[in-house]
Amino acid sequence: MASQGTKRSYEQMETDGERQNATEIRASVGKMIGGIGRFYIQMCTELKLNDYEGRLIQNSLTIERMVLSAFDERRNKYLEEHPSAGKDPKKTGGPIYKRVDGKWVRELVLYDKEEIRRIWRQANNGDDATAGLTHIMIWHSNLNDTTYQRTRALVRTGMDPRMCSLMQGSTLPRRSGAAGAAVKGVGTMVLELIRMIKRGINDRNFWRGENGRKTRIAYERMCNILKGKFQTAAQRAMMDQVRESRNPGNAEIEDLTFLARSALILRGSVAHKSCLPACVYGPAVASGYDFEKEGYSLVGIDPFKLLQTSQVYSLIRPNENPAHKSQLVWMACNSAAFEDLRVSSFIRGTRVLPRGKLSTRGVQIASNENMDSIVSSTLELRSRYWAIRTRSGGNTNQQRASAGQISIQPTFSVQRNLPFDKTTIMAAFTGNAEGRTSDMRAEIIKMMESARPEEVSFQGRGVFELSDERATNPIVPSFDMSNEGSYFFGDNAEEYDN
């Protein structure tokens, strides 16, 4: 992307940093990871978890959610002002799982939010360490992206379920900051904007008064974030139109839906970060590893190296397949929910299956599920190779607008050719070409039509041996291109419902 120079790197977003050099960035990301690890160790002590229980991913998720809840100021304020029966706004908690007499039992714990905040700040040298909180949010978001398909949310806003590969980060909270905005897919941003416009249509005071002014600023900011994800002039020009509209309405919704469809071929740039559960960082810190001193990157070899040596366990329901559960978590850890399965399989070194073929439900266990027949097993999170995470969208040629793969949003910077059946996508673009954006629409359609499927994305980029830390010898895989490897396509994954 030509404008790369004006953008902050993920690590700067992740650490709210000013311009830093690579070493400073690695150190500040390392500091953030170390803080999460120290917090996790302290929480395991508080909860009297043994080593095995502390490495249980379900316990990790509960502890992570407690700290996110403790720092959710808006919700905390709302809860104080709207007390609901049986809910203490000052407390947070969740299920903690322990081994008792050879069986797993669920124990519901409750803590003062103030106490959790104190432990978190103490682990982070007295800071609020918002970057660490965002990091945890992105891990939860990546896990949701891997576990659930957002078809229903898409259909509700008048979009097509085929656009699920644009939905990265759709469950991220609004307060996730610049680092969160970077990992949101084009579809996620479009969905947020359409929801906003619909509210404005139904509630005439939405854009008015002091609150309306704030709403308007938020609307324009979201438009700019989305504009920044597009890589062609025509798509960006259309976003300017949407942003500058005096009174956003159905015309804007149509423009946004058109843009989302166009992003299936003219891919947006969406960041990918490997955010791991706290129960990976904790034991690493406990073993004496100094993340800040050693430095850490979310987009290089570091997460792969960390997962190679980590032991993480998971509870398994009676009819679930532990290998499938492992794949789910592996994909979440590598932010690979929308990557081509052939690329993921090559990197992982074992075949990665589409969601509908997995015999596993989500990682979290509902409070009404019976614990009697629940067992635990080791998650296999290691990989055969490592690869650099990308944010380019995989368009083949940046000078001339060109195609990225259709049903996926690439995670890894690894060469692949583009099998796609353009006709099905192009069929969606017949119809409305008049109105104020007609020339831009025509240009976008022309670019999409000229995109050639025989092109190659990430030319010359390969994967690396885990011993090749400096990424000196790229191994360029060759893929059988008879089928395109989308994780969700032709599939029936459960829906995510908030």
Curated annotation (Swiss-Prot):
GO terms for biological process: symbiont entry into host cell; viral penetration into host nucleus. Late in virus-infected cells, may be cleaved from a 56-kDa protein to a 53-kDa protein by a cellular caspase. This cleavage might be a marker for the onset of apoptosis in infected cells or have a specific function in virus host interaction. Its main location: virion. GO terms for cellular component: helical viral capsid; host cell; host cell nucleus; ribonucleoprotein complex; viral nucleocapsid. GO terms for molecular function: RNA binding; structural molecule activity. It is found in: Virion; Host nucleus. Residues 8-21 have a biased composition (Basic and acidic residues). The keyword RNA-binding applies. Keywords: Capsid protein, Helical capsid protein, Host nucleus, Host-virus interaction, Ribonucleoprotein, RNA-binding, Viral nucleoprotein, Viral penetration into host nucleus, Virion, Virus entry into host cell. Transmembrane segments: none annotated. Residues 1-21 are annotated as: Disordered. Signal peptide: none annotated. A motif (Bipartite nuclear localization signal) lies at residues 198-216. A motif (Unconventional nuclear localization signal) lies at residues 1-18. The keyword Lyase does not apply. Homomultimerizes to form the nucleocapsid. May bind host exportin-1/XPO1. Binds to viral genomic RNA. Protein-RNA contacts are mediated by a combination of electrostatic interactions between positively charged residues and the phosphate backbone and planar interactions between aromatic side chains and bases. HAMAP family: INFV_NCAP. Encapsidates the negative strand viral RNA, protecting it from nucleases. The encapsidated genomic RNA is termed the ribonucleoprotein (RNP) and serves as template for transcription and replication. The RNP needs to be localized in the host nucleus to start an infectious cycle, but is too large to diffuse through the nuclear pore complex. NP comprises at least 2 nuclear localization signals that are responsible for the active RNP import into the nucleus through cellular importin alpha/beta pathway. Belongs to the influenza viruses nucleoprotein family. This is Nucleoprotein. It comes from Influenza A virus (strain A/USA:Memphis/10/1996 H1N1). The gene is NP.
